[in-house]
């Protein structure tokens, strides 16, 4: 991760600690396209830096991650795929289908799928690495990139984390 990514995540964590109103505005921003909710601008725009236009992939990813963090501000050292795989392993059977649908999303609707996934993680208090998610989303939302490799990495992380651990009882038919 870059210093810019680390600074942005530290900024979100500081907002969590001291400004519930900011988190409310960022959560509400998820009802809009990334970067189009004016009340979120004071908390995100300064990090957009040299984003040349309103559809810049990094700018869109910053807004998306800010809203997702506000929805579930639990930072952890696991990727999105690993977090969802852990949720699946812990007995949430419908997660696999939702995860496959998320992998099939395009740049225009990925945030909606992520909002649903993050809500499920929040319900089970499973955190994830928002800095990594920011970098991943920047790639996903870049129209010049094919998100195929990212999809494959998320799938590998999911299925590795979904494997039963030695102390997990196996289901019987």
Model regions: which residues?
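Basic, alpha-helical nucleic-acid-binding regions used in initiation and control of genome expression
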Residues: 8-173
């Amino acid at each position: 991760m870059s210093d810019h990514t680390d600074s942005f995540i530290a900024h979100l964590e500081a907002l969590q600690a001291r400004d519930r109103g900011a988190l409310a505005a960022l959560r509400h921003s998820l009802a809009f396209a990334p970067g189009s909710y004016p009340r979120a601008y004071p908390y995100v725009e300064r990090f957009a830096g040299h984003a040349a236009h309103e559809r810049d992939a990094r700018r869109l990813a910053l807004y998306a991650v800010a809203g997702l963090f506000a929805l579930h501000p639990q930072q952890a050292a696991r990727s999105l795929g690993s977090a969802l795989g852990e949720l699946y392993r812990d007995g949430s059977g419908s997660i696999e289908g939702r995860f496959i649908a998320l992998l099939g999303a395009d740049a225009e609707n990925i945030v909606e799928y992520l909002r649903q996934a993050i809500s499920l993680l929040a319900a089970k208090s499973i955190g994830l690495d928002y800095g990594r998610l920011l970098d991943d989303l920047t790639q996903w939302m870049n129209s010049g990139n094919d998100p195929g490799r990212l999809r494959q990495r998320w799938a590998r992380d999911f299925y590795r984390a979904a494997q039963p651990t030695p102390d997990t009882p196996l289901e019987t038919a």
